[in-house]
């Protein structure tokens, strides 16, 4: 049941609180613009939501949030576990400003064994299905590819695409070097290949000793039958497997699947390091840095006045915190930081595991605050999920290594942030841009890419909060111009990019004018919130002049326009900055910190533009002829490409081969053949 408070009525907390039930559920806070501020769960909605408005000593972070609340929505659930699941889904979908957020990494890599007659071993990202076998997830692409190399060396499973497999007439190089048994040409029977697949699967599941024992029995059986060549082949396979196991002896333990989670806080940031053990093999780790946690951690590290502030800093009930003697402020700060780390661990476990595969054991550096979370994970996984807080033996070594790696990753991040912030400051000073908070500095950079006028694309990349924001990158297909006219392309992309922003600001100003508010002030405020502070153009005086004309036509400030004229060979240090407002061109030199930022942004814009252009060009060249075929739609075209591996294979196919494709009749095959020849 969802209970919204209408946004067009004055916000009256007492009236809303009086209507809330004493039931479990999820609550959502909104500001005046309708943006979600916070999503939380509660065992008792009335008590939990009321605590935000009845306590007098809130932390600055929570107090600031409460002042911005303009609307409350609640959803009643049947249990606290159900509320936890709904809360996690809403946090991922809405990304509230005051919730601890982790990047939703849905594309964890897996090792896949396909459901083919001769299963293919492949690196895979995406959602899993029940048709194929999936092993993982793995912490990195490297871990998957290393496992594939091991399986190739020991079990010699195929890795080629089905379209290549179906068209082989002789073994490939992998067979010649002993990395594939060549099922494509019948060099191995179905039964023997199936045994290899089974052994590979058991190896990935941590049952290496079982596989080794069976191979030994198989070798002795061949020897007893005087089949010495087959026995030697199995012996070589055992030798390869023994080598792999020896190399991994330092990593192999008694556990099959374990995840190790270490949380470290320092310098206003938090790092969660996730190490994965799959099949008894330590596959490496990955560091995560949550957002929206900095303010809470700063409060914790700086000391919090009393228990209520400490509790609210991590959004926990005040009465859940221990009583601390007044003479132990150091302990208060330590406990506050630990509470934030526990809250971060809770958020990570919920956002990372709910809806995904969960190993049977989680080794953690901090005890999570929510007991319901573990119960929900066990229910979802279909097996008990154990949480180990104080591990022993090998697990303890793994946790210690994960904590050390978390500290190293956090120190590296803080160091990089410091140097990057210094470079941003140097750039702002070089361009005479005054700003109290450089984290708000937004830079957009444009580049044009094409091949002799073909497949022209423009790119726009964004630099904000001292780093590149890849989620805000945009590509623009350039049409209606003379091929190769970079000036016309630059005019088109700048007009398309900023014309809408100017229109939005004008509409907001007109609405305020009608309401009796100063529309010009609104227009300026709206424009400043939408537009970048600096616009970089990859080009010299000609491109900058075109940009100046566009900005003048749109009524925008031309002083924000800066051209980056590349030096000889695009070498960093030889660039010249060209200004649209008439300032003298500036050469920064190789040692300039400001130039490092400019070169980083410019090179990223060039990379983004050229990759898009190449993809567009390749698509046009590879599929244009098939798209022009009469009687061949998208599905038939896809089947042809899958069957023959590309346009070249389709062109080389005979009428009979074309007719063997599903959905292609003999008459249509003849028609296709005639159109392609």
Curated annotation (Swiss-Prot):
Give the signal peptide range.
none
Does the keyword Translocase feature in the UniProt annotation? no
Name one cellular component (GO) term: excinuclease repair complex
Task: Write out the annotated subcellular location.
Answer: Cytoplasm
Can the keyword Ligase be found in this entry's annotation? no
Q: Where is the GIY-YIG domain?
A: 22-100
Superkingdom, according to UniProt? Bacteria
* Chain's role: The UvrABC repair system catalyzes the recognition and processing of DNA lesions. UvrC both incises the 5' and 3' sides of the lesion. The N-terminal half is responsible for the 3' incision and the C-terminal half is responsible for the 5' incision.
The family note in this entry says: Belongs to the UvrC family.
Could you give the subunit structure recorded for this chain?
A: Interacts with UvrB in an incision complex.
Alphabetical list of HAMAP family matching this protein? UvrC
What name has this protein been given in UniProt? UvrABC system protein C
Species of origin reads Burkholderia lata (strain ATCC 17760 / DSM 23089 / LMG 22485 / NCIMB 9086 / R18194 / 383)
Taxonomic lineage per UniProt?
Bacteria, Pseudomonadati, Pseudomonadota, Betaproteobacteria, Burkholderiales
């Amino acid at each position: 049941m969802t209970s919204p408070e209408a946004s067009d009525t004055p916000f009256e907390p007492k009236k809303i609180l009086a209507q809330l039930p004493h039931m479990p559920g999820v609550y959502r806070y909104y500001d005046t613009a309708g943006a979600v501020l916070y999503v939380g769960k509660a065992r008792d909605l009335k008590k939990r939501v009321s605590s935000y408005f009845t306590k007098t000593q809130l932390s600055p972070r929570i107090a600031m949030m409460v002042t911005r609340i303009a609307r409350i929505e609640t959803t009643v659930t049947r249990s606290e576990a159900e509320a936890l699941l709904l809360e996690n889904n809403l946090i991922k979908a809405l990304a509230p400003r005051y919730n601890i957020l982790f990047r939703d990494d849905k594309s964890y890599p897996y090792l896949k064994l396909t459901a083919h007659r001769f299963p293919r071993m492949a690196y895979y990202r995406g959602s899993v299905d029940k048709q194929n076998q999936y092993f993982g997830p793995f912490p990195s692409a490297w871990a998957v590819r290393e496992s594939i190399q091991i399986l190739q060396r020991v079990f010699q499973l195929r890795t080629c695409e089905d379209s290549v497999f179906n068209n082989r007439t002789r073994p490939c190089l992998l067979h010649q070097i002993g990395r594939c048994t060549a099922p494509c040409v019948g060099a191995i029977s179905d039964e023997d290949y199936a045994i290899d697949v089974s052994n590979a699967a058991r190896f990935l599941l941590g049952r290496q000793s079982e596989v080794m024992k069976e191979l030994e029995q198989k070798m002795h059986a061949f020897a007893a039958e005087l089949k010495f060549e087959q026995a030697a082949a199995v012996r070589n396979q055992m030798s390869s497997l023994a080598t792999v196991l020896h190399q991994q002896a330092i990593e192999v333990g008694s556990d099959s699947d374990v995840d190790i989670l270490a949380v470290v806080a320092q310098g206003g940031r938090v790092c969660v390091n996730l190490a994965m053990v799959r099949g008894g093999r330590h596959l490496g780790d990955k560091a995560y840095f949550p957002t929206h946690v900095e303010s809470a951690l700063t409060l914790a590290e700086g000391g919090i006045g009393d228990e209520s502030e400490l509790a609210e800093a991590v959004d926990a009930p005040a009465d859940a915190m221990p009583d601390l003697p007044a003479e132990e402020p150091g302990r208060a700060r330590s406990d506050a930081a630990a509470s934030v780390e526990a809250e971060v661990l809770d958020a990570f476990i919920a956002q990372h595991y709910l809806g995904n595969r969960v190993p049977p054991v989680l080794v953690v550096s901090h005890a999570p605050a929510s007991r319901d979370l573990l119960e929900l994970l066990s229910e979802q996984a279909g097996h008990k999920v154990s949480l180990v807080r104080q591990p022993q033996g090998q697990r303890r070594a793994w946790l210690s290594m994960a904590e050390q790696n978390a500290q190293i990753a956090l120190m590296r991040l803080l160091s990089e942030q410091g140097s990057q912030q210094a470079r941003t400051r140097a750039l702002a000073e070089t361009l005479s841009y005054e700003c109290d908070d450089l984290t708000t500095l937004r830079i957009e950079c444009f580049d044009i890419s094409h091949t002799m006028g073909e497949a022209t694309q423009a790119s726009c990349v964004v630099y904000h909060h001292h780093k590149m924001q890849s989620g805000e990158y945009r590509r623009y297909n350039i049409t209606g111009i003379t091929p190769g006219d970079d000036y016309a392309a630059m005019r088109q992309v700048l007009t398309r990019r900023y014309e809408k922003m100017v229109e939005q600001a004008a509409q907001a100003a007109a609405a305020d004018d009608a309401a009796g508010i100063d529309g010009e002030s609104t227009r300026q405020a709206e424009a400043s919130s939408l537009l970048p502070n600096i616009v970089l153009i990859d080009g010299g005086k000609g491109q900058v002049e075109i940009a100046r004309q566009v900005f003048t036509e749109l009524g925008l400030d031309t002083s924000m326009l800066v051209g980056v004229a590349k030096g000889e060979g695009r070498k960093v240090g030889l660039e010249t900055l060209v200004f649209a407002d008439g300032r003298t061109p500036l050469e920064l030199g190789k040692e300039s910190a400001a130039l490092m930022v400019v070169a980083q942004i410019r090179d990223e814009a060039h990379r983004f533009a050229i990759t898009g252009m190449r993809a567009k060009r390749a698509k046009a060249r590879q599929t244009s002829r098939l798209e022009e075929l009469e009687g061949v739609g998208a599905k038939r075209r896809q089947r042809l490409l899958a069957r023959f591996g590309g346009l070249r294979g389709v062109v080389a196919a005979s009428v009979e081969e074309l007719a063997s494709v599903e959905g292609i009749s003999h008459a249509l095959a003849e028609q296709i053949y005639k159109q392609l020849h």
